């Protein structure tokens, strides 16, 4: 059905149809006069009477004029799904933007607006998702189909952890990953692509980018584009998929821009009145079903470090685990710089992960907490003034700190040390051994940047 543009206000375009009214979220293709430009897609956001609709553009609207012809597609934006999307970069409308070959015409396409799985379809059992990263598996374990918040400032290693997770999922669980770059820097997207290529994980991941420079419609809907690709692998292939969203804050931010452009009355701090329901709609689609699961890791930018800001606060309600990266730990040279006392997980309970794992995790945390409490005394009076039992706690805590570091596969290029995937049972055995005092006579440097405890013993032998 044809219509015509009647008004353009930045990324908001009003379109008039003759005797036809497109549905909300329907995609409208604009016929551009300049054939060299990519196609422009509008998405219906509101009905404004008299067969007119207000739409949000998924790309820049430069060169758009009144009276320009539009075609209603009869359905929402549809993006390619399946094996064809792996190793490629897509924009919000599902077109490849990596200068590679076109997506085959017979590739299946799914609508980006989908319902969340029903209660009957959802899986009720809680299972741990093993990542092979010691600090995560021991202290803040991820659950299959769970949502993890990744908190950290610039340059503390968020991207490296994301890439390591993609690597481990591909090689240990032979699963696929989907990465949605929501409103982040173009340079970071480019770097990530090349780093993945160098680390040999690219052919197991689909990338969807809606960068900072793009209009709010593209930045908002790109999260749905990526999620749709992940849902296909879960529902049709029965796989456990990893879904990365970097950055979930930008999803809320772009929604707020769209809301203002559409003239809705803002709510707290200028955010859209529908913030909680928009976030809920996205997050409810990320879950485990009887067929497979989508486990998501979402980087969360906290504006001005204010955790009560409505955008991060709306994310917290949905998270099952948090992985907090700490600059002080990174400064000590301990990578991954995960804060063992700040990171939390809903499934860190004896009923789900078992008594042994639970006791070891809590034991490690209590030793680290005691060490933290003693640091003021050490700074003022020095180690010699501590009691013998406190000296032992400090020695074990320092070993635990070093043992929480681990060489990554994707960082082999920079560090020169081969990456390690540590099975959960080895992680638990190693830390329990430190707590029990089995390794009190081994120097702490032997625990630094190794995999399992057997490597510590081998390293200690070499150091003699």
From Swiss-Prot:
<dbReference type="InterPro" id="IPR004100">
    <property type="entry name" value="ATPase_F1/V1/A1_a/bsu_N"/>
</dbReference>
<dbReference type="InterPro" id="IPR036121">
    <property type="entry name" value="ATPase_F1/V1/A1_a/bsu_N_sf"/>
</dbReference>
<keyword id="KW-0547">Nucleotide-binding</keyword>
<dbReference type="Pfam" id="PF02874">
    <property type="entry name" value="ATP-synt_ab_N"/>
</dbReference>
<comment type="function">
    <text>Produces ATP from ADP in the presence of a proton gradient across the membrane. The catalytic sites are hosted primarily by the beta subunits.</text>
</comment>
<dbReference type="InterPro" id="IPR050053">
    <property type="entry name" value="ATPase_alpha/beta_chains"/>
</dbReference>
<keyword id="KW-0067">ATP-binding</keyword>
<dbReference type="GO" id="GO:0046933">
    <property type="term" value="F:proton-transporting ATP synthase activity, rotational mechanism"/>
</dbReference>
<keyword id="KW-0066">ATP synthesis</keyword>
<dbReference type="InterPro" id="IPR000194">
    <property type="entry name" value="ATPase_F1/V1/A1_a/bsu_nucl-bd"/>
</dbReference>
<dbReference type="GO" id="GO:0005524">
    <property type="term" value="F:ATP binding"/>
</dbReference>
<dbReference type="InterPro" id="IPR024034">
    <property type="entry name" value="ATPase_F1/V1_b/a_C"/>
</dbReference>
<feature type="binding site">
    <location>
        <begin position="152"/>
        <end position="159"/>
    </location>
    <ligand>
        <name>ATP</name>
    </ligand>
</feature>
<comment type="similarity">
    <text>Belongs to the ATPase alpha/beta chains family.</text>
</comment>
<dbReference type="InterPro" id="IPR003593">
    <property type="entry name" value="AAA+_ATPase"/>
</dbReference>
<keyword id="KW-0813">Transport</keyword>
<dbReference type="Pfam" id="PF00006">
    <property type="entry name" value="ATP-synt_ab"/>
</dbReference>
<dbReference type="GO" id="GO:0016887">
    <property type="term" value="F:ATP hydrolysis activity"/>
</dbReference>
<keyword id="KW-1278">Translocase</keyword>
<keyword id="KW-0472">Membrane</keyword>
<protein>
    <recommendedName>
        <fullName>ATP synthase subunit beta</fullName>
        <ecNumber>7.1.2.2</ecNumber>
    </recommendedName>
</protein>
<comment type="subunit">
    <text>F-type ATPases have 2 components, CF(1) - the catalytic core - and CF(0) - the membrane proton channel. CF(1) has five subunits: alpha(3), beta(3), gamma(1), delta(1), epsilon(1). CF(0) has three main subunits: a(1), b(2) and c(9-12). The alpha and beta chains form an alternating ring which encloses part of the gamma chain. CF(1) is attached to CF(0) by a central stalk formed by the gamma and epsilon chains, while a peripheral stalk is formed by the delta and b chains.</text>
</comment>
<keyword id="KW-0406">Ion transport</keyword>
<dbReference type="InterPro" id="IPR027417">
    <property type="entry name" value="P-loop_NTPase"/>
</dbReference>
<dbReference type="InterPro" id="IPR020003">
    <property type="entry name" value="ATPase_a/bsu_AS"/>
</dbReference>
<keyword id="KW-0375">Hydrogen ion transport</keyword>
<dbReference type="Pfam" id="PF22919">
    <property type="entry name" value="ATP-synt_VA_C"/>
</dbReference>
<dbReference type="GO" id="GO:0045259">
    <property type="term" value="C:proton-transporting ATP synthase complex"/>
</dbReference>
<keyword id="KW-0139">CF(1)</keyword>
<dbReference type="InterPro" id="IPR055190">
    <property type="entry name" value="ATP-synt_VA_C"/>
</dbReference>
<dbReference type="GO" id="GO:0005886">
    <property type="term" value="C:plasma membrane"/>
</dbReference>
<keyword id="KW-1003">Cell membrane</keyword>
<dbReference type="InterPro" id="IPR005722">
    <property type="entry name" value="ATP_synth_F1_bsu"/>
</dbReference>
<keyword id="KW-0997">Cell inner membrane</keyword>
């Amino acid at each position: 059905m044809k219509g015509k543009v009647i008004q353009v206000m930045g990324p908001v375009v009003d379109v008039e149809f003759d005797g036809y009214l497109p549905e909300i979220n329907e995609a409208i293709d604009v016929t551009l006069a300049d054939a060299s430009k990519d196609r422009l897609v509008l998405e219906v956001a509101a009905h404004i009477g008299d067969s007119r609709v207000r739409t949000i553009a998924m790309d820049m609207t430069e060169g758009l004029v009144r009276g320009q012809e539009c075609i209603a597609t009869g359905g929402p934006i549809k993006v390619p799904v399946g094996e064809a999307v792996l190793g490629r970069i897509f924009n919000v409308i599902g077109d490849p933007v990596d200068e590679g070959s076109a997506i085959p015409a017979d590739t299946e396409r799914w609508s980006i607006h989908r319902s969340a799985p029903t209660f009957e379809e959802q899986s009720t059992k809680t299972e741990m998702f093993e990542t092979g990263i010691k600090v995560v598996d021991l202290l803040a374990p991820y659950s299959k189909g769970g949502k993890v918040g990744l908190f950290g400032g610039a340059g503390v290693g968020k991207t490296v952890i994301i890439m390591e997770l993609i690597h481990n999922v591909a090689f240990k669980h032979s699963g696929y990953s989907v990465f949605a770059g929501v409103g982040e820097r173009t340079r970071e997207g480019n770097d990530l692509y090349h780093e993945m290529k160098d680390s040999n994980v690219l052919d197991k991941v689909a990338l969807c980018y809606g960068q900072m420079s793009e209009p709010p419609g593209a930045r908002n809907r790109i999260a749905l584009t990526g999620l749709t690709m992940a849902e296909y692998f879960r529902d049709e292939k029965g796989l456990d998929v990893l879904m990365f969203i970097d950055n979930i804050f930008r999803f809320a931010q772009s929604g707020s821009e769209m809301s203002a452009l559409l003239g809705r009355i803002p709510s707290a701090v200028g955010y859209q009145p529908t913030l909680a329901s928009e976030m809920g709609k996205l997050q409810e689609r990320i879950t485990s079903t009887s067929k497979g699961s989508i486990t998501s890791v979402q980087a969360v930018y906290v504006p001005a470090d204010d955790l009560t800001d409505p955008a991060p606060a709306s994310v917290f309600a949905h998270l099952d685990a948090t992985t907090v990266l700490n600059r002080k730990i990174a400064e000590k040279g301990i990578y991954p710089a995960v804060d063992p006392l700040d990171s939390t997980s809903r499934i860190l309970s004896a009923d789900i992960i078992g008594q042994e794992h639970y006791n070891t995790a809590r034991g490690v945390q209590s030793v680290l907490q005691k060490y933290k409490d003693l640091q003021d005394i050490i700074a003022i009076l020095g180690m010699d003034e501590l009691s013998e039992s406190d000296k032992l706690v400090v020695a074990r805590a320092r070993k635990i700190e070093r043992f929480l570091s681990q060489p990554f596969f994707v960082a082999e290029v920079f560090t020169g040390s081969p990456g390690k995937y540590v099975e959960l049972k080895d992680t638990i055995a190693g830390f329990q051994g430190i707590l029990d005092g089995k390794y009190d006579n081994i120097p702490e440097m032997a625990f630094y940047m190794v995999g399992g405890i057997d490597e510590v013993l081998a390293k200690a032998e070499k150091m003699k």
